[in-house]
Amino acid sequence: MTLTVLNPATEEPIAELEQAGVEETDDAVARAKAAFPAWSAVAPGDRARLLRRLATLVEENLEELARIESGNVGKPISGARGEIGMVAQVFHFYAGAVDKHHGETIPVAGGVAATFREPLGVVGLIVPWNFPANIASWKLGPALACGNTIVLKPAELTPLSAIRLGELCLDAGIPEGVVNVLVGKGSVVGQRLIEHPDVAKIAFTGSTEVGRLVMQGAAGTIKRVTLELGGKSANVVFEDADLEKAAAAAPMIKPIKGSFFKSRLRGFSSSMLLHSILLQTKAGR
């Protein structure tokens, strides 16, 4: 079964992709599982080198990736360029973090207690449609740095930048099977990843409602779960703030900046934290 990918700004088709189902999901998990022993044994310095190479490739292909992101998400190219630049920064950061997560040796009475940090195994990464490349990098970076292998499921509406990132992982020298990208429905591919016994962890960004389903599905195999749900992005206004600017910026509906920021990508107007004195004296604003 094929999936037609649209540019939401023009509603024009921009790609036709094969949709993964349960069988393809199982195959991807099997590939990731087979790649795990060798990848987890790669020396930290070598993993860091590969992540730096990946970051460099993102920088070298920034314009291409930005145009993919702009066309697939329907956002201005200027914003997409900034987001892809941040993707490279994320991979650079985790390249530097590879040798910073380690265990401890703790002296105790009559002996020594030691802790070790080890990769989990296969992790399922499920990302939303609003910042597909950015959020994919937030999940790919730490998973790769720690020696895990990956099945990445982008939103079926916006899979194109994730596919290109998967190709760049191979170009960077990350072995085949370490990063697997699946295009398919959340109710099929996502659900199978959540319930699969060989997936050790799920990292999900999306709605609170679906997050509850992720927790319920993962409970059967007692896998670890990281959820980023229903962000409120509250505005915090202190006593000495410029209230005119705060009042204007909070709804994010001003021309140009606000209209793009509110184009069904993210919103900020639902929450505001005010200093108590402001509530007492200037609540009218």
What residue ranges belong to the model's regions?
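Conserved small-residue-rich beta-alpha loop and adjacent elements
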Residues: 101-176
